[in-house]
C-alpha cells in the first residue's frame, strides 16, 4: 500500500472533516485530529493558518497531489482570465484521474489514479496512463475491457453515496463524456472548499 493511500483517512482526522464523504471515515466517530493530543481544544487560527488549511484540504482531496504539481496548477490558473480560484477548481476537475473518479469508475481518488497508471483508461480511444493528463471538453473517457470486470470498478459503480455530476455525461457503465469545465458550486464536494483562501496563500 502506498504511503499516500495509507494516509488518506489521516487527512480526514487532521482536518476534522470527512473529506471524501465516505461512510467508513474515522471522522464519523470522532472529529479531533490524529495522535494523543488530538482532543486538545484549539485556539483561534490565524489568517495564515486558515489559508494553509484550505490549501491542504483542497490538495488532499485531489489525491494528495504533490506540492510541485499543485503550485504549477495554481500558477496556470492565475494566468488565465477570470477568477483564479474558479480557474483552479476547473483545472483540478480536468485531471484524468479526477474524471475517472467522477465517472464512478473507481471508489476513491487514489484508486482512480491506480487504474489510470495501470493503463485501464482510454481517452478518445487512446490508452492514457498519466493521471494528471488534462481532459478537454468533448473528450470521451472509457474503461478498457479488463477494467470492466475489476472488483473495485464494480464496487465504485454501486456506491449509493456518490452521484455522477452533470458535467460528466455517462454513456452506459463504461464510457463518459466531459461536457464542460465546472464552477465551484457545481462540484460535488462533501465538505466546503475555499479556493479563495488558497489564492490568498499563494499571493502572500
Curated annotation (Swiss-Prot):
Keyword Cell inner membrane included in the entry's annotation: no
GO molecular function: rRNA binding; structural constituent of ribosome
Pfam family, one: S4
Region of interest (Disordered), ranges: 1-49
Gene Ontology cellular component list: small ribosomal subunit
Protein keywords: Ribonucleoprotein, Ribosomal protein, RNA-binding, rRNA-binding
Annotated Gene3D superfamilies: Ribosomal Protein S4 Delta 41, Chain A, domain 1, RNA-binding S4 domain
Residue ranges constituting the S4 RNA-binding domain according to the UniProt record: 94-154
An individual GO BP term: ribosomal small subunit biogenesis
Family: Belongs to the universal ribosomal protein uS4 family.
Protein function: One of the primary rRNA binding proteins, it binds directly to 16S rRNA where it nucleates assembly of the body of the 30S subunit.
Subunit architecture: Part of the 30S ribosomal subunit. Contacts protein S5. The interaction surface between S4 and S5 is involved in control of translational fidelity.
Listed name of the protein: Small ribosomal subunit protein uS4
Taxonomic lineage: Bacteria, Pseudomonadati, Pseudomonadota, Alphaproteobacteria, Sphingomonadales
Amino acid at each position: 500500500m502506498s504511503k499516500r493511500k495509507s494516509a488518506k483517512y489521516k487527512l480526514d482526522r487532521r482536518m476534522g472533516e470527512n473529506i471524501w464523504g465516505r461512510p467508513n471515515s474515522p471522522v464519523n466517530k470522532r472529529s479531533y485530529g490524529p495522535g494523543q493530543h488530538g482532543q486538545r481544544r484549539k485556539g483561534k487560527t490565524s489568517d495564515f493558518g486558515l489559508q494553509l488549511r484550505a490549501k491542504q484540504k483542497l490538495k488532499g482531496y485531489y489525491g494528495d497531489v504533490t506540492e510541485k504539481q499543485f503550485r504549477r496548477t495554481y500558477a496556470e490558473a492565475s494566468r488565465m482570465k477570470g477568477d483564479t480560484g474558479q480557474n483552479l477548481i476547473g483545472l483540478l476537475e480536468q485531471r484524468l484521474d479526477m474524471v475517472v473518479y467522477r465517472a464512478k469508475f473507481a471508489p476513491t481518488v487514489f484508486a482512480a489514479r491506480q487504474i489510470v497508471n495501470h493503463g485501464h483508461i482510454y481517452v478518445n480511444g487512446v490508452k492514457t496512463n498519466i493521471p494528471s493528463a488534462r481532459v478537454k471538453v468533448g473528450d470521451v473517457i472509457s474503461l478498457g475491457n479488463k477494467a470492466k470486470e475489476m472488483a473495485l470498478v464494480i464496487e465504485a459503480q454501486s456506491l449509493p453515496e456518490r452521484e455522477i455530476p452533470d458535467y460528466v455525461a455517462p454513456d452506459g457503465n463504461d464510457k463518459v463524456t466531459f461536457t464542460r469545465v465546472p464552477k465551484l458550486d457545481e462540484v460535488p464536494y462533501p465538505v466546503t472548499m475555499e479556493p479563495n483562501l488558497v489564492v490568498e496563500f499563494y499571493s502572500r
